[in-house]
Amino acid sequence: TLVLEIFRQDHALKMSLFEQGELALTLRHYSQTSVSFIEIDKLCQEVVSLLNKVNKKITAGQDLIASLTKVGQLLWDNLLTRPVKNRLKSSSILDLILSIDEELINIPWELLYDGTSFLALNFNLGRVVRTKEEISLPQYRSFSPTPKMLILANPTNDLKSAYLEGINIRNQFDRKRNNVHIDFKSTSIDKLYVKKHFCEYDIVHFAGHCEYDPVSPENSGWVLSDGRFSVEDILNMGSTISLPILVFSNACHWAKATPGLIDLDYQQKNYNLASAFLFSGVRHYLGAIRRI
């Protein structure tokens, strides 16, 4: 596995790319590049605009891909140093961990374009975020011999597609019933049910609505039949018991006025929910950026 560490220092980025086994080395090379973060912010906004054109079906096919590659190429050119670019392009390793400061989470690193492909298509890519928040060491869960998976689908009973998604996942895993135990719950899912059963499972898949509270972000969370399963609820649970190893949250910020569109600050909104799970002991979090 490759690890790309990137630190923000004023108007520059300092970075180092190394194999995970090299963590114990006494010395490690790093390189630095000056960055105009005003320009980077504009490019990030352009990425969101392009993705929203897909959702609104304004632009499709090759025109959109061409525009996205241009923006991705500019991000690649302006964010990474030459040594890092060269090693990424020549590496035969397929797994890449991106370790970044939380100030850099709004950048769509996965869409950096190296001239031939996007970073997320070249690597199995994951993020590790460094935070200034003081956190206690969470209780990490070990995988059971036969992992248990909970599917929570359409808890508010107004998303047929979320229900069908849950059914499809259950049916797919049904073929492997000797290897993984699946429980499926749909409609009328309340907060008490989730709090009681969430920590019994190794994997949780949620398909439904999520609401973001800009005034009190700790109240943001999954929308259930009787309210939100919030960031605060997650943090409270994580202080007493081990949470699932993997949470797949196929939910995004519900907005009736502009359904299907992506907010300019979508990375930050997703980070609030993701960080709550990760701080509480969830090892892996997958989340959607598109409104549902």
Specify the residue positions occupied by each region the protein language model found.
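Catalytic cores of nucleophile-dependent amide-cleaving enzymes
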Residues: 123-147, 155-157, 203-292
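Domain-scale, conserved, charged regions that form catalytic cores
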Residues: 1-207, 214-216
